[in-house]
Design a protein with these regions (language model features):
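A short amphipathic helical element positioned immediately N-terminal to and/or at the very start
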Residues: 1-10, 87
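Alpha-helical scaffold elements within enzyme catalytic domains, especially in hydrolases
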Residues: 8, 90-91, 141
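Short, strongly hydrophobic transmembrane alpha-helices
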Residues: 12-41, 50
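Membrane-proximal extracellular/periplasmic loop immediately following the first transmembrane helix
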Residues: 36-121
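Membrane-embedded glycan transfer/ligation machinery
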Residues: 3, 18, 51-53, 135
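Residue-level marker of alpha-helix boundaries and capping positions
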Residues: 27, 78, 128-130
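Mid-to-C-terminal secondary-structure elements
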Residues: 96-99, 105-231
Length: 231
């Protein structure tokens, strides 16, 4: 029986060769064209990890010295910070606004900037490349964004926590890759830079999130800004 099949295939080898070539060509086209489309579609359908549907970003700017209404006496750092917080409170008092939080720096969810670092789990030698986001404590940052709760403290508790220098909050996927657990509370990360070693206690975690809507979730660390640099 197999000999008969082989004879038939051999007798039609030219026709079967074309069929095989067409099959290979279709497979290559499918792999080159369809595979990236499937991957991109899958990545876009992964939840962001925060409530983007109800968020609105308001950009603020400063008057130039030659602009009408410019007040040179209001340019000292203390006044600038006070005015900034007053604007945030002003926005929060609008009808229909549930919460507002200041966003400083160039790296925040779906921003055009990025900030990367390498962290180690204490006692480990394998580095993890991680995105870094700065935030201001006691400004409803985590609950305003609507981040999903992780193990331990809620987003509201993380917003109002009394942070010490070097404290950080991790996404759960960052905690898993560093410590092999989603509950990293009480553990410490290590940052090494030019021979200096910095220990960073983990205060809590939030659910995995997408830094950019086209990306898959990546490890993210949130660093509290205990002072504001107005320079």
């Amino acid at each position: 029986m197999f000999k008969l099949i082989w004879k038939n295939l051999w007798a039609r080898r030219r026709k079967n060769g074309w069929l095989l070539a067409e099959l290979i060509l279709v497979s290559i086209i499918s792999w080159v064209v369809l595979d990236p489309v499937i991957v991109v579609t899958h990545d876009r359908n992964i939840p962001l990890g925060y409530d983007a549907e109800r968020l609105c970003l308001i950009s603020l700017g400063a008057l130039q010295p030659q602009a009408p209404g410019y007040d040179a006496e209001a340019q000292d750092s203390a006044t600038l910070v006070d005015n900034y917080y007053n604007l945030v409170r002003y926005v929060k008092d609008f009808d229909g606004v549930e919460s507002a939080t200041p966003v400083l720096g160039f790296c925040y969810p779906n921003s055009s900037g990025s900030s990367n670092s390498q962290l180690f789990a204490e006692g480990d030698t394998i580095p993890l490349s991680i995105m870094m986001i700065q935030f201001l404590p006691h400004t409803n940052f985590f609950d305003t964004y609507g981040f999903r709760s992780g193990k331990g403290r809620t987003p509201g508790q993380l917003s109002d926590y009394a942070y010490a220098p070097n404290d950080i909050v991790l996404t759960e996927n960052a905690a898993e890759q560093l410590f092999h657990t989603k509950d990293a509370h009480g553990k410490r990360c290590v940052s090494r830079d030019h021979g200096d070693t910095l220990y960073m206690p983990v205060v809590g975690t939030i659910g995995a999130m997408k830094m950019y809507s086209e990306w898959r979730p990546v490890p993210v660390a949130f660093m509290p800004m205990l002072t504001i640099d107005t320079s």
